[in-house]
């Protein structure tokens, strides 16, 4: 994973995960933290796209918060680490960017990588809301058109 190929919003989303994990008392930074970050960063494209899929953004975020509150909690001064599932998303997002002809990894590539390889909890969440690659790409096309991230 080459962080220099990530857009500012992508870097912001990655960086926010540590605080989210800390706030929830989690040692492992996982896809739930990342999806929450993608949904709650300022001017979130992902939140906009979720709403374009006729999903209530606030309810969706509340469901992610529920997943976060169910994760194993630790106390004290602990070292945070990234889960294998989240690492896979971060690495595969570069492939998503290349597939779309983009030079940089943006938040939509990160979301597509998560849709392609969700962990168990995120897979169930996406299933509940009917979030699929095709549906996501369809709403993305209405926002992005044929622009690329270069």
List where the protein language model places each region:
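Histone-fold recognition with a strong bias for associated Lys/Arg-rich disordered tails
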Residues: 1-150
């Amino acid at each position: 994973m080459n962080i220099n190929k990530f857009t500012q919003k992508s870097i912001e989303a990655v960086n926010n995960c540590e605080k989210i994990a800390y706030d929830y008392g989690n040692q492992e930074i996982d896809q739930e933290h990342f999806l929450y970050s993608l949904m709650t960063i300022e001017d979130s494209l992902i939140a906009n796209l979720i709403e374009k899929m006729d999903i209530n953004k606030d309810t969706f975020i509340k469901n992610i918060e529920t997943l976060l509150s169910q994760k194993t909690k630790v106390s004290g001064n602990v070292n945070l680490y990234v889960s294998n599932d989240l690492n896979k998303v971060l690495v595969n997002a570069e492939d998503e960017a290349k597939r779309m002809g983009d030079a940089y990894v943006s938040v939509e590539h990160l979301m597509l990588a998560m849709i392609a390889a969700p962990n168990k909890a995120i897979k169930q969440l996406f299933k509940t809301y009917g979030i699929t690659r095709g549906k996501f790409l369809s709403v993305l096309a209405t926002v992005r058109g044929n622009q690329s991230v270069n």
